[in-house]
Design a protein with these regions (language model features):
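Phosphate/pyrophosphate-binding active-site loops
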Residues: 1-114
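Basic amphipathic alpha-helical segments that dock to polyanions
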Residues: 144, 166-176, 191
Length: 204
């Protein structure tokens, strides 16, 4: 692949249709890092661009892989690979490195999903069987898997259950060891699903 200095994302995508979308993503990321269009935040935006492009190409439905972790972990080699393209025009070594980053990120994502699934099954088994048809405790638990940091007021409003009912459910999850209070305050207390967050933090 040959990329001109002023090439845009759309032109790279258009001119390299014979290449796999992952290869095009590598070329786009390299070009963005070369142009550095912003005064600040180019690295973060460049890494975000990888995810957005893979989603736009239909390779991802959700942003579930974190390529940034591999790039940060191998930062010296990352910059060396980009510099080598600028120095010699050798895109192949850069594309190979980029594909290694995507492969590593995908493996990490699969591992995290498996851990989250096991955590889900483990904690579901801890929940007492509901005494009523409407299972507020299960509703709160399901909510936690999308919002692992909560406060009682906002959660009760979102789930459309009373403050006292939400407070009781939160207390139960704290007693079961699923939730943990992080504020140690009398009012406006915040609780976190620490085991869930720890899995998400790992590898980021």
């Amino acid at each position: 692949a040959k990329v001109s200095e002023g090439a845009s994302v759309s032109s790279i995508n258009r001119e390299n249709q014979d290449y796999d979308p992952l290869v095009r993503a590598a070329l786009i990321h390299y070009q963005f890092e070369t142009i550095h269009p912003f005064l600040d935040g180019n690295g973060r935006i460049g890494r975000l661009l990888i995810l957005l492009y893979l989603m736009e190409q239909g390779l991802l439905k959700e942003p579930v892989i974190y390529v940034s972790y591999f790039l940060k972990k191998n930062q010296v080699e990352y910059y060396d690979r980009i510099s080598e393209v600028r120095r010699s025009g050798n895109y192949e070594q850069w594309v190979k490195f980029f594909l290694e980053a995507v492969d590593s990120a995908a493996s990490d994502a699969v591992e995290s999903i498996e851990k989250l699934s096991k955590l889900h099954e483990k904690n579901i088994a801890l929940l007492p069987k509901p005494k009523r048809k409407k299972d507020n405790l299960r509703m709160l638990f399901d909510y936690l898997e999308k919002h692992p940091i909560i406060d009682i007021k906002h959660t009760s409003e979102t789930l459309k259950i009373s403050y006292n009912t939400t407070s009781t459910a939160v207390k139960t999850l704290v007693e079961l060891g699923i939730l943990r209070e992080t504020t140690n305050a009398a009012r406006n207390r915040v609780f976190s699903y620490e085991a869930y967050l720890e899995i998400l933090r790992n590898g980021t």
